[in-house]
A protein has these predicted regions:
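Short, low-complexity N-terminal intrinsically disordered segments enriched in polar/charged residues
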Residues: 1-2, 14
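Intrinsic-disorder/low-complexity, polar/charged segments enriched in Ser/Thr/Lys/Arg/Asp/Glu/Gln
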Residues: 2, 35-37, 90-92
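A short beta-strand micro-motif
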Residues: 3-10
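Short, structured beta-strand/loop micro-motifs enriched in basic residues and often containing a Trp
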Residues: 10-22
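Short loop/turn segments at secondary-structure transitions that flank enzyme active sites
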Residues: 11-13, 42-44, 101
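Short, flexible N-terminal segments of the mature chain
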Residues: 19-43
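Short, Lys/Arg- and Gly-enriched loop/turn segments at beta-strand edges
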Residues: 43-53
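Short, compact, well-ordered microdomains
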Residues: 55-101
Length: 101
C-alpha cells in the first residue's frame, strides 16, 4: 500500500536557534502543502533523511495495512501526524494510507 505524506506546517524557533545553534548554510526547504508519495513503505525522493527517520515506523506500518496508533489517537485510524526531529525548525507531516483499504 502507498502512503501520502503532506507537509502541514513548518516553524522556526528563532530565539532558540540564535542562542544554541551554530550557523548553517542550508535550512529545510520543504513547503507547506508539499506532497510526497511513499511506494510500499519506501522513502520518497526529495524527503530529507531526518524527517524520514522520524516517520519511517508510521509509514511502514500504514503501508503494511496497520494503523490505529496509540489506541485511537487519530480520527482516521489509517493516518498519523508526525514532526521531524529538528528542535529549531520542526516540520509537521500528515501521513495517510492511500489505495487499498
Amino acid at each position: 500500500m502507498d502512503c501520502k505524506i503532506t507537509v502541514m506546517r513548518k516553524t522556526w524557533y528563532k530565539d532558540l536557534s540564535e542562542k544554541y545553534e551554530n550557523p548553517i548554510s542550508h535550512a529545510c526547504d520543504l513547503e507547506e502543502g508539499q506532497v510526497f508519495i511513499s511506494k510500499g513503505g519506501q522513502k520518497p525522493q526529495g524527503l530529507c533523511e531526518s524527517a524520514w527517520e522520524s516517520m519511517r515506523f508510521f509509514v511502514e506500518t500504514l503501508a503494511s495495512g496497520g494503523g490505529n496508533f496509540y489506541d485511537g489517537w487519530m480520527k482516521n485510524e489509517k493516518s498519523a501526524m508526525i514532526s521531524c526531529n529538528d528542535g529549531f525548525r520542526p516540520v509537521s507531516f500528515y501521513i495517510e494510507s492511500i489505495g487499498e483499504n
